[in-house]
Amino acid sequence: YCIIGGYNANYHTKSETHEHFIGAKEGENVLILGGCGPMGLGAVSYALAMKNKPKKVVVTEINDDRLARARKVISEEYAKEKGVELHYVNTAKMDDEVEELLKITDGVGYHDVFVYAPIRQIAEVGDKVMAFDGCMNLFAGPADSVFSAEMNLYNAHYKNTKILGSSGGIKTDLLEALDLIFKKEVNPAVMITHIGGLDAYADTTLHLPEIPGGKKLIYTQIHMPLTAIEDFRKMGEENELDRKST
């Protein structure tokens, strides 16, 4: 629900009124920086399901394996079926990240930018590629209390760009999340890479920073070591019980 809260924290304006319009700008461009982790993929899934859908969603990453998994769980073809043009890009392979990200939008820029990694360079790129009336959300919470980055104040004045941060959500965000999951319009499973039983809970919690992948799902009613979902098929070839699970 905090992902939905992030989208709902963004706002835009219209020249003929002083009202603020809540949420992502319908029919425009969304950029999710560092978006191939579990929360970023949740943000992609929601972008394809929300009422005010964007025209284009661009997701950045610097790791090819994470990009490959992202394409597997939420493909460009699936997004197209939902009426959204989805792009996954490896910014580590770009000569000029800002120029190439803007090129995807034909120079227009991004109306809603989400920073899913608390890294100065990423935040500064987001600021540089905002469209007119763009809004950038620092979704990833930094641990450094003096974390800072440069912002183009000229654009804040003349292009009406905005920067905000969001953490968590409210009751209506939670209710919307539950409704979308119930209707199978979003797929929270894209965020999960490992599952385990209650006996794996303590060790997983203690070593969480050392375990790669996305979210870890613990089933309280079973006994099972923490296992990567992608390993199930291989395990099934070696063990009949695992084969039945697969």
Question: In which residue ranges do the predicted regions lie?
Answer:
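A glycine-rich, Thr/Ser-enriched phosphate-binding loop motif common to dinucleotide/cofactor-binding enzymes
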Residues: Y1-K14, C36-P38
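Short helix-loop-beta connector
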Residues: T13-N29, V108
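Adenosine-nucleotide cofactor-binding segment
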Residues: L33, V44-A123
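Hydrophobic/small residue at the entry helix of a nucleotide-binding pocket
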Residues: P38-M39, R66
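Glycine-centered, small-residue-biased loops immediately flanking beta-strands
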Residues: K55, G134-C135
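C-terminal hydrophobic helical "lid"/dimerization subdomain
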Residues: D95-D96, E100, E124-K128, K171-S245
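Helix-to-beta-strand junctions that scaffold the AdoMet/dcAdoMet cofactor pocket
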Residues: M130-F132
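Rossmann-fold NAD(P)-binding glycine/threonine-rich loop
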Residues: A140-N160
